[in-house]
Amino acid sequence: MPTIQQLVRKGRQDKVAKTKTAALKGSPQRRGVCTRVYTTTPKKPNSALRKVARVKLTSGIEVTAYIPGEGHNLQEHSIVLVRGGRVKDLPGVRYKIIRGSADTQGVKNRKQARSRYGAKKEKS
């Protein structure tokens, strides 16, 4: 416990809140270049081959980003747009790639939740 005199001299220091998406540097999204596209397996009760990519962002930081939806056209040197948002069963994956922007195509034959996957409205 500090004395009154110590508080007068130094004062209290505010706690600094740590952001969950540090690599975006305060931006809502950031552009980047894929350095590696691969699959990885999720944590214990789940089983799958989740599609992820290592992305070098314009902020200079390299992050692992999840590729949502079924099927993708990404490969090394693809330009992608990255947003925040973790994948609960993939440790260390705290970003997601935005489908339908830059070099990333939208999901084919997507009928519902199309805006999340960059899918165009089907011609009726």
UniProtKB/Swiss-Prot annotation:
Compositional bias (Basic residues): 108-118
Signal sequence, renumbered to the chain: none
GO biological process: translation
Chain positions found as 3-methylthioaspartic acid: D89
Entry similarity comment: Belongs to the universal ribosomal protein uS12 family.
Known function: With S4 and S5 plays an important role in translational accuracy. Interacts with and stabilizes bases of the 16S rRNA that are involved in tRNA selection in the A site and with the mRNA backbone. Located at the interface of the 30S and 50S subunits, it traverses the body of the 30S subunit contacting proteins on the other side and probably holding the rRNA structure together. The combined cluster of proteins S8, S12 and S17 appears to hold together the shoulder and platform of the 30S subunit.
RNA-binding among keywords: yes
Protein's gene: rpsL
GO MF term set: rRNA binding; structural constituent of ribosome; tRNA binding
Domain of life: Bacteria
Keyword RNA-binding annotated: yes
Keywords annotated in UniProt: Methylation, Ribonucleoprotein, Ribosomal protein, RNA-binding, rRNA-binding, tRNA-binding
Organism: Saccharopolyspora erythraea (strain ATCC 11635 / DSM 40517 / JCM 4748 / NBRC 13426 / NCIMB 8594 / NRRL 2338)
Annotated PROSITE patterns: RIBOSOMAL_S12
Cystine residue pairs: none
Pfam families: Ribosom_S12_S23
InterPro entries from the UniProt entry: NA-bd_OB-fold, Ribosomal_uS12, Ribosomal_uS12_bac
Oligomer status and interactors: Part of the 30S ribosomal subunit. Contacts proteins S8 and S17. May interact with IF1 in the 30S initiation complex.
Protein name per Swiss-Prot or TrEMBL: Small ribosomal subunit protein uS12
Region (Disordered): 1-30, 102-124
GO cellular component: small ribosomal subunit
